[in-house]
Swiss-Prot record:
The active site is at H440, K442, D447, H709, K711, D716. Residues 65-87, 95-114, 233-269, 810-850, 859-906, 934-943, 1122-1142 have a biased composition (Low complexity). Keywords: Coiled coil, Hydrolase, Lipid degradation, Lipid metabolism, Repeat. GO terms for biological process: phospholipid catabolic process; phospholipid metabolic process. Residues 55-121, 222-269, 300-320, 810-966, 983-1007, 1116-1167 are annotated as: Disordered. Residues 131-192, 803-835, 1059-1096 form a coiled coil. Inhibited by butan-1-ol. Residues 987-1003 have a biased composition (Pro residues). This is Phospholipase D A. InterPro entries: PLD-like_dom (IPR025202), PLipase_D/transphosphatidylase (IPR001736), PLipase_D_fam (IPR015679). It catalyses: a 1,2-diacyl-sn-glycero-3-phosphocholine + H2O = a 1,2-diacyl-sn-glycero-3-phosphate + choline + H(+). Belongs to the phospholipase D family.
């Protein structure tokens, strides 16, 4: 370097006095010294920068870096102070570097050099870290060596029977081996150690796998281990030229470490403190490595990353969510696929711009609407094609399944959907690797303004109602592969979707229980952004780029939602994230009263080598409750067995890890609690449950588990976590399966309830969601008798009598649930059964027996969409209940009086259970002691609009107990046949011989009826069916709800109707006619009572009436199938005449159907109150001993005993081996024992914790444990 380059610093030094130079060098020396000792010093306020040209060589390379950024770690590592010992600095510059000042003597030179401290690059590595950190690094180095040995064993023992599978697996193993070796090399350099690992035996195929590995994009994540050392901040090893591109970063795990994060991420970390904070993380969380950072150009970026830097998505902490908490969100929760499919059908139907779908498994031929028949217009492929033809862009991401493990037909689904229209684009991902992990997200996004997240795929085997029917011999609801039972038979060839895979007359289907959440506003935008990031990461040049919608949205709801993910670079193109696990841990730690979990799997840290801490936190919270003598409950609902045959290897593996978490092992949940708390009854604190049901199929009883596929957790009636993540490492570790979930709270819309006997303020949304789930499990919801069952299916005692040839009294006992149509058509003669079972008395006709709280129902899990989406206002589909309960204020118990053959009368109390023998546990009578579940403004009778409507449509009080006669014409039914409801349970029971019939529901006149179009907002739906002498009344009046929680940026106006003077006059005339007809009917009833005592109707007359009823139903079905879409105007044109006809809606829906899609569940009313009148069960307090032991535990114990007694070959504690299980499958069901099934209540059973206890369930092959964890 020339002398001119050295003269400016020398001249500057001569002009300054000597002491200031010494102070400057002292200041810089201390600064460098502290920086070398503390990496966290980067985030502190540094000392003022000094011009280093005055005492360092101008020609030194690090000078530019120092001037550009004096506070970064890379600068401190690259900064080099020249001293007399730096003889290797290179070339002629070494002599000039030794001269700081030509006018100073040698002693001054030495003194100045002694004041310059060594830099971080000149410090030995073992001085830069604490002893604990070095110990952790050493432990990790040993662990990496063991993992490399395991990889070698797997490479050497790999079977080459299948060349394609051999290459795929070897590529994956080679990739893992390379990643482990890179990390081990970094640790060796840090610790100054030498690690030697034996290389695997070479094979001829290694050259091919190496070439493919170089071509295929590799995952950024460098950690395949679950237990790695912790560190406070990411430690970048870039201190010399050999490691400028390598780094080692670990995630914060302790309270102290999380508070000392680096300054580069402090702003984004603080962004989440109001929602999910790392300060609440358990100190027992084993850390895991985060992806390697690319530190080139002093920027923390990822190669090919699509995550914008400087945003919350770029947060380096994998435990924190990338998306912020969103306030004022409207949330709808859907239980079982019947409700969700109807809501999704309406949402897609009303899409105007875009539809995004992600799926683990997708069947284009799945039917979304199945009542009153399988609707071809709402088959998924037809619906998507129709919307694509209307100009809507449809983008779908499917998991490209591993062919060696499963076959879900993703290629067929992609080809079929893309053939429908050019506006449908489908991506399969990943192309080859990773082999073991999957895309497990299940989402539906409409116009980036409404989103659904949960565990439901649009595929076969998912559709179900809350009754979970087992049989469908006539393919009424489940067609072809949709009738599915993987436990007793395979799905078969998925390429032939409408061929049955099992024999419907011998094998029951496996019911499916699942949950979805719908959100709007910014929460939906977050789900859309997740999809867009994934799409842009997965796509190739053929597919278009997607863009995020930034249009402002107005908040309309009351809930707080935060999007959680399990993602990695391979699955989403960004940094690793496992915020779902963080949310679960924090919610469990913060629980005060109870935890309710439904999940497909339960594999956690109490099983060997499992990382996630869910079970650890549960045990810790239970121990705390025991120590403080608190009342604390943990409900865990999981499947009885996995969806497969128990002899299959993968099913055994799943069972092994689940049992290793719960009970089989010294450190399992139950063994640990029993050992640490030997004097405590653990049933008071934790219970493991499953769901099961039964049916009568072709002369024998069958049973099957209700497969729990939901992934949710409810805490203290205030917090919900719902999504697609199972409780296992696959879903929670972040590096494996891609998952999505929401954590939902609502601190604005609250309700006064009870908790452990004390007054408690709960979230109305969460409280009602729990009620909906528990009513289903306890059997407190009305029966949905569709598809219709055989006549004897619902009366077990009569089936036993039939087999004993006791035919003399059959007609006095047979259940007539499915013959009510015949009874109603033959009121004068038909007395086929004198003992009427009113299992369905909770249905839509008997609404006087249920509580109704208008505001509560608005926040219950919606059962069917009634409000619709349009281009300017987006609303999540809400429920349309089928009862006019808003006008009902009485809650008396209804009894049905029957007449036996001797003429005496017997009163039989109605029940909500499968049989009428169980009358419920009387825990608490409805009185003042029960808490008030609704404020005055919540009650429907306090709504002025509903009061006026009730006054208009309700008959006089004196007529309440008189049977109403028909006033409508059959033509009205045929005109409005799209929405008619003709299920058997909706028909009123025949009049009794000794007592007047039960009071009918309030009537509404046809003048106030609106047949809503799918683009309008909620309304009334009343249809009357003139069937000889009886009336079918269906009231789906969602406009009676005084507040509807809508998922929209702008609420749609509520459609109302005004009654003109002429209409009122017509209504009065109709009421007068009704009174006259009622008087005539009373006379007919008296005559009927006399005839009943004299003679019984002949079988020939009964058959004639039955044929007549069937002909009328066929006529209605033909009329329904002949209706075609209307093609007039885009606007609603209300037209009516003065004759009292119903108001008609004429729309221009193009190729879209005229009516809105409906679910079967929406046609049945379920009380919104926690108190169930029929059974005297109150669900308000989930922790009180009366409910917990008297109802919950007692129901599970009773059902478990009954099922274990009746059915020999089901998962139960007495079966210890697979051989024993196979032998018991050959034993038929005893009809004598089947009488016990009449006592089954709901579908709760205890999980068989000792099932196959004597069987070795652990998989025998290596390197596959993480598949099941």
């Amino acid at each position: 370097m020339s002398n001119n380059s050295k003269s400016p610093p020398n001249e500057q030094h001569q002009q300054q006095p000597h002491p200031p130079d010494v102070l400057v060098q002292l200041t810089e020396s201390f600064q460098h010294f502290f920086q070398s000792l503390s990496p966290q010093y980067q985030s502190m306020t540094s000392l003022p920068s000094i011009n280093k040209d005055s005492y360092t060589s101008v020609g030194s390379a690090p000078t530019t870096n120092n001037n550009s950024n004096s506070n970064s770690n890379s600068n401190s590592s690259n900064r080099s102070l020249n001293n007399s010992g730096s003889s290797n600095s290179g070339g002629g510059g070494s002599n000039s570097n030794k001269k700081v000042n030509n006018n100073n003597n040698n002693n001054n030179n030495n003194n100045n050099n002694n004041l310059q401290s060594p830099t971080q690059s000149q410090f030995p590595y073992h001085y830069q870290y604490s002893s604990k950190a070095l110990h952790d690094f050493e432990e990790k180095r040993k662990l990496l060596i063991e993992q490399l040995k395991s990889v070698k064993i797997n490479l050497d023992t790999q079977c080459d029977d299948d060349p394609i599978s051999f290459i795929k697996i070897r590529m994956e193993l080679t990739k893992v081996k390379t990643s482990l070796e890179t990390e081990l090399k970094s640790l060796d350099e840090l610790l100054h150690t030498t690690s030697e690992v034996e290389e695997p035996n070479p094979t001829p195929i290694d050259s091919i796998t190496s070439l493919l590995t170089m071509i295929m994009p590799s995952s950024i994540s460098n950690s395949v281990t679950n237990n790695t050392p912790s560190s406070a901040t990411p430690l970048t090893l870039s201190n010399n030229n050999n490691y400028t591109s390598s780094s080692l970063a670990t995630s914060p795990t302790t309270n102290s470490s999380s508070s000392s994060s680096s300054s580069s991420s402090s702003s984004s970390t603080h962004y989440y403190n109001s929602s999910i904070s790392s300060n609440s993380l358990s100190s027992n969380l084993p850390p895991s490595s985060i992806p390697i950072l690319n530190t080139s150009n002093n920027k923390n970026s990822y190669p090919n990353s699509i995550i914008p830097q400087g945003t919350p998505l770029d947060n380096p902490d994998p435990n924190l969510p990338r998306f912020p908490q969103r306030d004022h969100i409207s949330v709808k929760l859907y239980v079982d696929c019947d409700d969700y499919f109807a809501a999704s059908a309406q949402a897609i139907e009303n899409a105007t711009r875009e539809v995004f779908i992600t799926a683990w498994f997708l069947s284009p031929e799945v039917y979304l609407i199945r009542f009153p028949s399988l609707d071809e217009r709402y088959r998924l492929d037809n619906l998507l094609k129709r919307k694509a033809m209307q100009g809507v862009k449809i983008f779908i991401i499917l998991w490209d399944e591993t062919k060696i493990a499963t076959f879900k037909g993703s290629k067929r689904a992609k080809d079929k959907l893309e053939e429908l229209h050019t506006n449908i684009k489908v991506i399969k991902h990943p192309p080859i690797i990773p082999i073991y992990w999957s895309h497990h997200q299940k989402t539906l996004i409409i116009d980036q303004e409404i989103a659904f997240v949960g565990g439901v795929d649009f595929c076969f085997g998912r559709f179900d109602t809350w009754c979970h029917h087992l049989i469908d011999v006539n393919s009424t609801l489940w067609k072809g592969k949709d009738y599915y039972n993987p436990i007793l038979g395979d799905m078969g060839d998925i390429l032939v979707p409408f061929e049955d895979s099992v024999d419907r007359k011998k094998i029951p289907r496996m019911p499916w229980h699942d949950v979805m959440a719908g959100v709007n506003g910014l929460a939906a935008r977050d789900v859309a952004l997740n999809f867009i990031l994934r799409w842009n990461h997965h796509k190739d040049d053929y597919y278009p780029q997607l863009y995020f919608d930034t249009t402002p949205l107005s908040p309309v709801g009351t809930s707080q939602c935060q999007l959680l993910r399990s993602m990695d670079e391979w699955s989403g193109g960004g940094r690793i994230e496992r915020s779902i696990h963080t949310a679960y841990v924090q919610a469990i730690e913060d629980a005060n009263h109870y935890i309710y979990i439904e999940n497909q799997n339960f594999v956690s840290t109490h099983a060997p080598n499992v990382w996630n801490q869910i079970s650890f936190e549960i045990v810790k919270r239970i121990k705390r409750a025991i120590r403080k003598k608190e009342v604390f409950r943990v409900f865990i609902v999981i499947p009885c067995q996995q969806d497969g045959k128990v002899e299959e290897t993968q099913i055994k593996g799943l069972m092994h890890w689940q049992y290793s978490t719960i009970i089989r092992g010294e450190n399992t949940i139950m063994k640990l609690l029993r050992r640490d708390c030997p004097d405590v009854d653990l049933t008071e604190y934790i219970c493991f449950l499953s769901l099961r049901t039964h049916a009568f199929l072709e002369g024998t009883f069958v049973t099957e588990q209700i497969y729990v596929h939901s992934k949710l957790m409810i805490v203290d009636d205030r917090t919900i976590i719902v999504g697609s993540a199972n409780i296992n490492d696959r879903s929670l570790i972040g590096e494996r399966d891609s998952e999505l979930a929401f954590i939902i709270r609502d601190e604005i819309d609250t309700i006064q309830t009870k908790m452990n006997g004390q007054d408690y303020i709960a979230s109305r949304l969460v409280f009602n969601f729990r009620l909906r789930l528990w009513k289903e499990h306890l059997g407190l919801l009305p029966q949905i008798n569709y598809p219709p069952h055989d006549q004897i299916n619902n009366d077990i005692n009569n089936i036993v009598n039939l087999n004993n040839n006791n035919n003399s009294n059959i007609n006095n006992n047979i259940n007539n649930n499915n013959n009510e149509i015949n009874n109603n058509n033959n009121n004068n003669n038909n007395n086929n059964s004198n003992e009427i079972n009113n299992n369905n008395s909770d249905g839509i006709l008997n609404n006087s027996n249920s509580f109704h709280h208008g505001s509560v129902s608005d926040n219950l899990p919606p059962l069917n969409p009634s409000s619709n989406l349009n281009s300017s206002n987006k609303k999540l589909p809400t429920t349309t209940t089928a009862a006019a309960a808003a006008t009902t204020t009485t809650t008396t118990t209804t009894t049905t009086t029957t007449t036996n053959g001797t003429g005496t009368t017997n009163k039989q109390k109605t029940s909500h259970h499968r049989s009428n023998s169980f009358q419920g546990l009387v825990l608490q009578s409805p009185g003042s002691n029960r808490s008030n579940l609704s404020s005055p403004q919540d009650s429907p009778q306090d709504s002025p609009r509903l009061k006026n409507l009730a006054e208009e449509i309700s008959p006089p009080p004196t007529e309440q107990h008189q049977h109403q006669s028909p006033i409508t014409d059959i033509n009205l039914i045929l005109e409005n046949v799209d929405t008619i409801i003709h299920s058997n349970e909706q028909l009123p029971p025949p009049p009794s011989s000794t007592t007047p019939p039960p009071p009918p529901p309030p009537l509404t006149t046809t003048d106030s009826v609106i047949i809503e179009d799918y683009k309008s907002d909620g309304g009334n739906l009343n249809i009357e069916n003139n069937n000889s002498n009886n009336t079918i009344l269906t009231n789906a009046a969602t406009s009676m709800n005084n507040s509807t929680s809508s998922l929209s940026s702008t609420s749609l106006p509520t459609t109302t109707t005004t009654t003109t003077a002429q209409q009122q006059q017509q209504q009065q005339q109709q009421q007068q006619q009704q009174q006259q007809q009622q008087q005539q009917q009373q006379q007919q009833q008296q005559q009927q009572q006399q005839q009943q005592q004299q003679q019984q109707p002949s079988q020939q007359q009964q058959q004639q009436q039955q044929q007549l009823s069937q002909q009328q139903q066929l006529q209605i079905k033909k009329k329904r199938s002949s209706i075609s879409p209307s093609t007039s105007s885009n606007k609603l044109l209300l037209s009516g005449n003065g004759s009292g006809d119903s108001i008609r809606v004429v729309t221009d829906s193009g190729s879209s159907p005229r009516g809105q899609p409906r679910s079967m569940s929406s046609l049945h009313d379920h009380a919104d109150s926690s108190y169930c009148q029929k059974s005297n069960i109150d669900l308000i307090d989930p922790t009180c001993s009366d409910f917990y032991f008297g109802v919950w535990i007692a129901t599970a114990a009773s059902n478990t005993r009954i099922y274990d007694t009746v059915f020999p070959a089901i998962p139960k504690n007495s079966i210890k081996t697979c051989e024993q299980f196979a032998q018991l499958q050959k034993i038929p069901v005893s009809l004598a024992d089947s009488k016990l099934l009449s006592e089954v209540r709901g579908n709760l059973v205890f999980h068989p914790l000792d099932f196959l206890e004597g069987e070795d369930l652990q998989p025998s092959f290596l390197f596959t444990d993480d598949l099941f964890q």
